[in-house]
């Protein structure tokens, strides 16, 4: 994973909102070794549908909001998701994710692109659902993701992700996230993969204005 990351400031506002971000996926980009777009896209969406099905009737589902990408595709994401769980709540697709991240208590990223780096850049508690073969990642990324799995950040199955969410429901998320061994790995990961933009204020304002 690699991205140009704005130096985002964490907002003082907090809520119980958990945001699950669905990324635009037309095929794999630089961090994936092979172009297996269609098969991997189907696997990605199938596992999200499983996760949403598992949420039905769960208390934690009351706090979860889905953020779709504003660019539509032939996959009809929203229709598929609602067919598995008609109670899902969605955020405004046109609103910038940057504006949403800082006010949430937890972010669920579903793809190892720029989105997860933006969450980590402000040290926002973040879980990642990564259902693909780790061998598709380059060696350096794979080493980190294996560590993230052990630390409870990355989850390979919808069932594992739900179990972690239910565990954190009864814990102080900030305390869990800021555990020293977790923060040490995250710090090294950000140093390796996040390129922070020195003109942070000007660039961030452009992004917000164009969102």
What annotation goes with each model-predicted range?
Residues 1, 83-86, 106, 111-193:
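Catalytic binding pocket for nucleotide-activated donors in carbohydrate/polymer assembly enzymes
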Residues 2-80:
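Conserved catalytic-core segment of nucleotide-activated headgroup transferases in glycan assembly
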Residues 15, 61, 103-105, 149:
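Short, well-ordered alpha-helix to beta-strand connector turns
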Residues 21, 66-69, 93, 108-112, ...:
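Short His-Asn-centered micro-motif
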Residues 53-54, 103, 110:
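Exposed, low-structure sequence patches enriched in small/polar residues
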Residues 76-93:
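Nucleotide-activated donor-binding/catalytic signature segment of Leloir-type glycosyltransferases, i.e.
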Residues 94-104, 121:
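Short acidic alpha-helix that forms the nucleotide-activated donor recognition element
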Residues 190-211:
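C-terminal alpha-helical cap of glycosyltransferases
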